[in-house]
Amino acid sequence: MMRSHADDSAEARPAPAMSVGVFIPIGNNGWLLSENAPQYRPSFALNKAITLKAEGYGLDFALSMIKLRGFGGKTEFWDHNLESFTLMAGLAAVTTRIRLFATAATLCLPPAIVARMAATIDSISDGRFGLNLVTGWQKPEYDQMGLWPGDAHFANRYDYLAEYAQILRDLWETGASDRKGAYFQMNDCRLSPRPQAPVKIICAGQSGAGLAFTAQYADYNFCLGKGLNTPTAFAPVVEKLAEASARTGRRVTAFALFMIIADETDDAAMATWAHYRAGADAEAIAWLGAQGAADTRSGSDTNVRQLADPASAVNLNMGTLVGSYASVAAMLDAVMTIDGVEGVLLVFDDFLKGLDAFGTRIQPLMRSRRHVTAAALPEVA
């Protein structure tokens, strides 16, 4: 078995409890730009099955992204996408425990409308709803609708998002906003009913500006895991988040995004990973690279720069954990050795099979999930 980055002596210490979420495939083919990976279109039926399975295995939350234009290529990567809020509203009606996060494309949706949609899904879910805020980095998504504000947005996008988040908080917490800024002007805007539970905000900032925004306005930060079987390589981003949070006096914890490719043995899992890499969709990857290069205003530390790095663009350069079920369990436990990390957000090469493997083969081996496996879980469909 491949050893994790956790020290062997950690076996004797209680492991911090890990929260686990699933990044459901709202777009076709999930997160693999490969002709050799499973090919499928998104549907409510698929995402319902995934989310119910995740709930049955005791996962803590499900998150859907928003993507309004794909990358093309032979696999038509992300050319076929559902819409995040309406999908999560449907899932809210058929689940009972798992928390649900939708993603707001803030260049398309006014904050007062998002506040009301969130309050509605809060009602459907009985307080289980949260919100992921994104600034919008891929110009063709918005330019096709005449909504791109100009390339200056690359530099001022977090100023825009700060006003947006302030209006959301005004409406959710007080039911009214009269806030007037550079981007939005509220005129005694009202919201009722308000959410019954606090709506948690998450952000995926990795740059200095993104982390500063998260520390001021969000409750959680999603970090991209890094590398192949290097579960703690993203730790410097968490350290920067802690520094930013110290300046605001707020507690903001991190979740790391990882792709899981697991099998009975390390060699079998690595063979699958090699097969996916061999089928990389070069045309779609080239589109991703071109869009990432379009932002000449931001620094080199943005999420987009990592996503578009040619090194492993076949899965958007997210952290990838490949190995036997035991190896993957150990590597996931290692994530929780980083101070300030609350958990992980997982994607799978095949979501239904992958969740079954996680729930029955990986999670039972994880010290950081003993609070789940020690409890009796409902039967999984």
UniProtKB/Swiss-Prot annotation:
It comes from the Bacteria. Transmembrane segments: none annotated. Its EC number is 1.14.99.46. Keywords: Flavoprotein, FMN, Monooxygenase, NADP, Oxidoreductase. The keyword tRNA-binding does not apply. Disulfide bonds: none annotated. GO terms for biological process: alkanesulfonate catabolic process; nitrogen utilization; uracil catabolic process. GO terms for molecular function: alkanesulfonate monooxygenase activity; uracil oxygenase activity. FMN binds at I66, K67, N132, E141, R157, Y158, S207. The keyword Methyltransferase does not apply. InterPro entries: Luciferase-like_dom, Luciferase-like_sf, Pyrimidine_monooxygenase_RutA, SsuD_RutA_monooxygenase. It catalyses: uracil + FMNH2 + NADH + O2 = (Z)-3-ureidoacrylate + FMN + NAD(+) + H2O + H(+); thymine + FMNH2 + NADH + O2 = (Z)-2-methylureidoacrylate + FMN + NAD(+) + H2O + H(+). The FMN-N(5)-oxide reacts spontaneously with NADH to produce FMN. Requires the flavin reductase RutF to regenerate FMN in vivo. NCBIfam families: RutA. This is Pyrimidine monooxygenase RutA. The gene is rutA.
